[in-house]
Amino acid sequence: MRLRTCLLGLLALCVASKCSYSPEPDQQRTLPPGWVSLGRVDSEEELSLTFALRQQNVERLSKLVQAVSDPGSPHYGKYLTLEDVAELVRPSPLTFRTVQKWLSAAGARNCHSVTTQDFLTCWLSVRQAELLLSGAEFHRYVGGPTEIHVIRSLRPYQLPKALAPHVDFVGGLHRFPPTSSLRQRPEPQVSGTVGLHLGVTPSVIRQRYNLTAQDVGSGTTNNSQACAQFLEQYFHASDLAEFMRLFGGNFAHQASVARVVGQQGRGRAGIEASLDVEYLMSAGANISTWVYSSPGRHESQEPFLQWLLLLSNESALPHVHTVSYGDDEDSLSSAYIQRVNTEFMKAAARGLTLLFASGDSGAGCWSVSRRHQFRPSFPASSPYVTTVGGTSFQNPFRVTTEIVDYISGGGFSNVFPQPSYQEEAVVQFLSSSPHLPPSSYFNASGRAYPDVAALSDGYWVVSNSVPIPWVSGTSASTPVFGGILSLINEHRLLSGLPPLGFLNPRLYQQRGAGLFDVTRGCHESCLNEEVQGQGFCSGPGWDPVTGWGTPNFPALLKALIKP
């Protein structure tokens, strides 16, 4: 014990001197709106911290993703197994040994890794963690839509410089739970209902996107789909059953989730969770559905990071995953964003389709040195996910053509360069759009998003046994598009073809084939004199508001069923 204390003391002296480094110097450490500090945490309280170990062969992984995702490649659709990915990226023995010894000397307990061995999660007391991570100071905070409690440090932390080649970042310190892409709008007023609908339901979705009663899962394949839940959001099985009773009468469907991965709470259902499950399972009807429930088993855990760890630890996963959460790019450290992006590369190499909501703040807005700029969202801005924007009906009470939903997130990343698969489409947009914002507001050479869109306005949801109208946001459009891709995977599997995997290279090569082009409307942005609240506007072809457009199922199936 005396030796361990001595080692910790030496480490603390080292960290306080020049032999330390900060893994995340650019991580935002301000308290997010809606959160309040409850004070310091007791020094003997236990924390669960996740150490992201430096991976190997990331460049090679990137090339493999390109090979298995490009229809023009001879390796298209020849996905890697989890074991293949682990063999490629697992940290060097030196990295694993160095970090383990460092943690053991600090008194870390119950450490466990994942199949790919690139994350290590350990338990430490607050006192041990603050000695280990010099500068960290843990407080308990309460906030979020469900008033959850988390333990975080708003102060920068440092590690011994000897660990710089071995540790990307430490999870469980700074990042608060991600925000949801969900709004509830007041119900529009309408007189008379003949020939009208009073909100988006599965039958409206199926009518608009040309899904027939026969467009459901066959029940004979190993096809599956999943959505992820955070922020202590839970769905209730009884709500799903009631939703299908009310709205699922004209198509075959499953009225229960096949598997819940993680903890499913017993509290009140969340509208977000209910929406995701109900519309993933009604768009991707009669297809086995998993729910990843990652509230964070402990106050110090990061739910989104826990979900990524689950993906790195299971060999057999659903083919399509939809996630309706995100953060502002500028609120996250470069180390964290780049590492999470690599996790998405790992998923793409395995043939998983990851869909993320584009957000509900239009182009976003923030002020840098008193100058306004648009504010992109992550993971929506990752070049290895398919990002889904939002639309509204031109006539809100009729199944008509779609226009931009003004809240639909979209824009250009300030972190990721523009991937080659979308360069031609972006150049075409920038050279032809008559309503471009000033160039100082966005990074025209960054990854542009969204890639596609779907209806995001005026949904009916059943939550806590109550039908709730006019729920809106790209949290709605994302599971709808995901369910439709699951139906296409069903046809591919029945034809002996691999699942779609990472969709973007094929999507951009086909230049919107199988999608309804949305050409009217603009989304919101900065409320200043220069742009007056207007961000980007949609137009013919791809645009950074609705991507290539919304699904026309028969045409999209025809475009994507080809080998």
Swiss-Prot record:
Annotated S-S bridges: C111-C122, C365-C526, C522-C537
Segment forming the signal sequence: 1-19
PROSITE patterns, per database record: SEDOLISIN
First-tier enzyme category under EC: hydrolase
UniProt cofactor note: Binds 1 Ca(2+) ion per subunit.
Cofactor: Ca(2+)
SMART domains: Pro-kuma_activ
Stated name of the protein: Tripeptidyl-peptidase 1
Lineage: Eukaryota, Metazoa, Chordata, Craniata, Vertebrata
